C-alpha cells in the first residue's frame, strides 16, 4: 500500500528541531499521530548521524516500560552520545511519571524529544511548571477533505464530498474501505477505545452509562448552544438525576480526549467571552454520525457546520461562536496580529428567510473584517454579495478562504 505523507505535520516537526524544545504531537486517537511519528522516524533514519530510540506504548513489546525509571533505563541502554539521539515515544501518557524523564533529558545537547499523547491535560501541573514554555504542541486532526481524496483515491466531486460528509476523516478507513456497515463498526470501535482509555480509565469514571449518554447527546446536538442546566434537564427527562457540576466535569473529560471540542461564545458588540452556554463539535464527523445511528439527512446542517469548524482550525484560526443582540454568527475566527473573519455555515440558501438569517446577521456587524457564508447551494462556487463572500463548501475545503 502506498505511503501517504501528511507533509504539513512533518514540516512543523522540522521547524522545532534543534531548538532545545520538547515536541508534543497531540490529538484524538486514530487520527494519525502514530503514523506521523513513524514517518518522521523513517525520514530521520536516513541520517547516519541519528540514533533513534523508538517506543510505542500500544505495542506489547514495550509493555515492560511502565514508569519513568523503566523509561530512563531503556533510553540509557540505547543512547549514543556521539550522535543525535531522537527519543520518540508514542502515547507517552501511558508511562507513569513520564514527565520526570522528559525533564531529565530535554536539555541534553545530544537529545531531541518527540512524543505523542491523546490527552490535553498531559502537560498540566508538574511538567508544565518545570519546563515552562520549552515545548511545542502539534495538533493532528482527522483528514481534511483534500487528504480524504488522496487517501481514498477519489476525484474532487459532489459525490466525493458526500462521502466525506458521511464517513469523516479517520485515516484507518483507507484499509477498512467505505462500505457503510464496515465503516460504522470501525468508527464505533475507535469511539469505544477513546472512551475507555482516555476518558474512563484516566479519570476513574464510575457513572459510565451517563458518560455515554452525554456523548450521544452532544453528538445529536453538535453545533447547538448548550448549557449544563439544559443537559441536566434533558437527563432528568430520561430518568437520570445528574448535577450540573458532574455534567461540566464529564464534558471536560470528553474534551480532554480531543474527541470533542468545546467552543466558547463571544459577544461581538461587547467584545467579551461568555462563561456559559457553549457549542460542541466532534473531531471526526464520521464518529459523530455513528453515535446518532448513521448519516441522517435532517442532520446535514450540523455536519456541515462541524466540518467547517474543523477546517477553520486547520487553517490556523482560533474559533469562537459570535453573539449579536439579535442573532448569532456561527464562527468568529482570529489569528495573531489582529486578523479576524466572520463565517456563517449553511446547507442551502433556498429562500429569503435563510438568506436573511445568514447574510443579514453578517451585515449587522459594523466593522470591515472579512465576512463569509459557506454553503452547499447549487451553482455557487464563489460570489460576492455586497462585500460578503459566498463560497461553496467544496471550494472552501480545497481553496480555503478566498476574497
Regions found by a protein language model. Give the residues of each.
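Structural recognition of the conserved hydrophobic beta-strand(s) that form the central parallel beta-sheet
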Residues: 112-118, 139
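Short regulatory helix/loop adjacent to the ATP-binding pocket of P-loop NTPases
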Residues: 121-136, 152-153
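Accessory nucleic acid-recognition modules appended to NTPase machines
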Residues: 180-339
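Hydrophobic anchor at the beta1->P-loop junction of P-loop NTPases
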Residues: 25
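Pre-Walker A adenine-sensing motif
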Residues: 4-17
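Domain-level recognition of nuclease-like catalytic cores that cleave nucleotide substrates
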Residues: 378-403
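Short glycine-rich substrate-engagement loop in P-loop NTPases that contacts/grips substrate
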Residues: 53-83
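Walker A/P-loop
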Residues: 34
Amino acid at each position: 500500500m502506498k505511503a501517504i505523507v501528511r507533509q504539513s505535520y512533518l514540516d512543523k516537526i522540522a521547524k522545532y528541531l534543534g531548538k532545545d524544545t520538547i515536541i508534543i504531537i497531540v490529538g484524538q486517537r486514530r487520527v494519525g499521530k502514530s503514523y506521523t511519528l513513524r514517518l518522521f522516524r523513517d525520514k530521520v533514519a536516513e541520517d547516519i548521524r541519528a540514533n533513534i530510540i523508538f517506543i510505542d506504548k500500544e505495542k506489547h513489546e514495550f509493555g515492560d516500560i511502565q514508569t519513568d525509571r523503566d523509561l530512563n533505563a531503556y533510553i540509557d541502554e540505547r543512547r549514543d552520545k556521539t550522535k543525535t539521539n531522537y527519543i520518540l515515544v508514542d502515547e507517552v501518557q501511558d508511562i507513569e511519571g513520564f514527565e520526570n524523564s522528559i525533564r531529565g533529558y530535554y536539555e541534553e545537547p545530544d537529545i531531541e524529544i518527540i512524543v505523542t499523547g491523546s490527552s490535553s491535560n498531559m502537560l498540566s501541573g508538574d511538567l508544565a511548571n518545570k519546563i515552562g514554555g520549552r515545548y511545542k504542541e502539534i495538533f493532528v486532526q482527522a483528514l481534511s477533505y483534500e487528504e480524504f481524496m488522496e487517501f481514498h483515491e477519489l476525484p474532487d466531486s459532489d459525490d466525493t464530498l458526500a462521502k466525506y460528509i458521511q464517513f469523516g476523516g479517520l485515516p484507518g478507513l483507507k484499509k477498512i474501505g467505505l462500505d457503510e456497515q464496515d465503516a460504522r463498526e470501525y468508527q464505533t470501535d475507535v469511539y469505544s477505545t477513546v472512551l475507555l482509555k482516555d476518558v474512563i480509565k484516566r479519570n476513574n469514571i464510575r457513572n459510565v452509562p451517563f458518560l455515554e449518554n452525554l456523548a450521544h447527546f452532544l453528538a445529536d446536538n453538535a453545533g447547538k448552544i448548550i448549557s449544563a442546566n439544559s443537559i441536566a434537564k434533558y437527563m432528568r427527562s430520561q430518568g437520570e438525576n445528574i448535577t450540573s457540576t458532574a455534567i461540566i466535569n464529564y464534558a471536560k473529560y470528553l474534551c480532554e480526549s480531543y474527541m470533542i471540542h468545546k467552543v466558547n461564545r463571544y459577544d461581538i458588540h461587547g467584545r467579551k467571552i461568555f462563561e456559559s452556554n457553549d457549542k460542541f463539535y466532534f473531531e471526526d464527523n464520521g464518529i459523530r454520525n455513528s453515535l446518532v445511528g448513521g448519516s441522517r439527512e435532517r442532520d446535514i446542517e450540523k455536519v456541515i457546520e462541524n466540518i467547517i469548524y474543523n477546517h477553520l482550525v486547520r487553517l490556523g484560526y482560533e474559533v469562537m461562536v459570535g453573539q449579536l443582540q439579535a442573532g448569532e454568527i456561527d464562527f468568529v475566527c482570529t489569528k495573531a496580529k489582529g486578523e479576524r473573519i466572520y463565517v456563517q455555515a449553511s446547507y442551502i440558501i433556498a429562500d429569503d428567510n435563510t438568506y436573511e438569517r445568514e447574510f443579514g446577521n453578517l451585515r449587522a456587524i459594523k466593522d470591515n473584517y472579512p465576512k463569509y457564508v459557506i454553503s452547499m447551494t447549487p451553482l455557487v462556487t464563489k460570489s460576492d454579495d455586497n462585500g460578503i463572500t459566498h463560497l461553496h463548501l467544496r471550494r472552501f475545503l480545497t481553496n480555503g478562504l478566498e476574497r
